[in-house]
Amino acid sequence: MYIKNLELINFRNYEILSLKLHSGINVFIGDNAQGKTNILESIYYCSIGKSHRTNKDKELIKWGARDAYISVYISKERLDKKIDIKIFKEGKKGVRVNSIKLKTISDLIGVFNVVMFSPEDLKIVKESPSYRRKFLDIELSKLNKKYYYSLVRYNKVLNERNTILRKWNSNTEVTEVYDHQLSKYGSYIIKERLKYIESLSIRGNKIHKDITSQKENIEFKYITSIKDLNNIQNDFYNLLRENVKKDFEKGSTSFGPHRDDFAVNINNTDTRTFGSQGQQRTAVLTIKLASLEIIKEQTGEYPVLLLDDVLSELDINRQKYILNSIREFQTIITGTGLIDIREYLDDHVKLFKVTNGTVNQ
C-alpha cells in the first residue's frame, strides 16, 4: 500500500497543496514551524478520522477559512482508492471512499493503515498507563472491527455504570445488569490485548536485538487485575460484584480494561522507571516497527510509515538501521537536518523542501 497523491485545501497552514509521492521514501526537510508535521497529520487523519495532535477539528482549518479538505489517492492490493475528507468549522466532517459517503467515521478505520512515530510517542513508554491503552486501542481497532465496536460499547456501559455509582445510594443490585455487560465486552477487549501483546513481544524482541546489536532483549507484559485468564469473563464479573460497595464509595469503576496497562522491560528491567532516554526512545521505535509487521502479517500489506522528526534524535547506527529497514514500503519522513539518506537508499528517495506552507522538490 502506498499514497500516490496528496491534496490539501485550507488545512493548517496550507491554502492549496498537491503532491505526487514516491512509492518508496519521501523526505520533507525544513525549519521548525513551516508545515512539515501538518503533512503527516493530514495523512494520519485519513487513516483513523482524527488528528494525533488535537481533539478539536476546527484547529485543523486554516485561519479565516470555513472548512478544510484532505484527499489521498492510494494504491492498495493493486487497486486504487481515493479518500476525501471535508472538515467543517461547526464540528462536522464528511468522509468519502471512492466517492461513496461513509455512514460513520468508524467505517474509515482499516481502509488505509498508517503507523506514525513522533516525539509525542515517547509517552507510550514514559508516561501514565492511559497512553499505552490508547496505543493498544488504536492498533487493535485498525485490525479488528469487533474490537473497535466492543470498545465503544464497553465505554458506553462504563460511563452509565459510573453515573449510577455517583448518583444512587449504594444499591448494589442496580449495577448488576451493567456488570454483566461490562464483563462481556471487557473480557473480549482483554483477550485481544493479550494476544496483541504476545505478538508485539515476539516481533519486538527480534527487532530490538537487531537495533541494539544483540545487546538488549525487550519484553512486553500485559498487566490486568483479572487472575483467571482462562475464564476472563466470569472472573471479571465476580471482581465487579465483589468491589461494588467500594465503587459506590469512590464513584467510579475500580477494575477493568480501562485500568489495565502493559510493562515495557529491557533486560528484565522496567524501562519506564529505570530506562535511559536512549533506551526509552529505542523501545518506542521497536514498538512502532513491530506494530508495522503485525499489520503486514494480518492484512497482507505494509502500512505507510510516518516518521515525524525522530531520526535526528537517534544515534547514527539506529538511523542506519531504520533506513535499511524501510525499503519494502512507503515511508514519509520529516526533519530539520538529516544524514544524507541517499547514500543508503539510492533512487528510493524523493526529497521535498518545506517553507512556510509551500513545498518544492
Curated annotation (Swiss-Prot):
Cellular component aspect of the GO annotation: cytoplasm
Domain of life: Bacteria
InterPro entries in the record: DNA-binding_RecF, DNA-binding_RecF_CS, P-loop_NTPase, RecF/RecN/SMC_N, RecF_2
Molecular function via GO: ATP binding; single-stranded DNA binding
Binding positions (ATP): 30-37
Any single Pfam family the record assigns to this protein: SMC_N
BP GO terms, sorted: DNA replication; DNA synthesis involved in DNA repair; double-strand break repair; SOS response
PROSITE patterns for the chain: RECF_1, RECF_2
Localization terms from the record: Cytoplasm
Keyword Signal: no
Keywords of the record: ATP-binding, Cytoplasm, DNA damage, DNA repair, DNA replication, DNA-binding, Nucleotide-binding, SOS response
Annotated function: The RecF protein is involved in DNA metabolism; it is required for DNA replication and normal SOS inducibility. RecF binds preferentially to single-stranded, linear DNA. It also seems to bind ATP.
HAMAP family tied to this protein: RecF (MF_00365)
Membership in a protein family: Belongs to the RecF family.
NCBIfam families: recf
The protein's name: DNA replication and repair protein RecF
Species this protein is from: Clostridium novyi (strain NT)
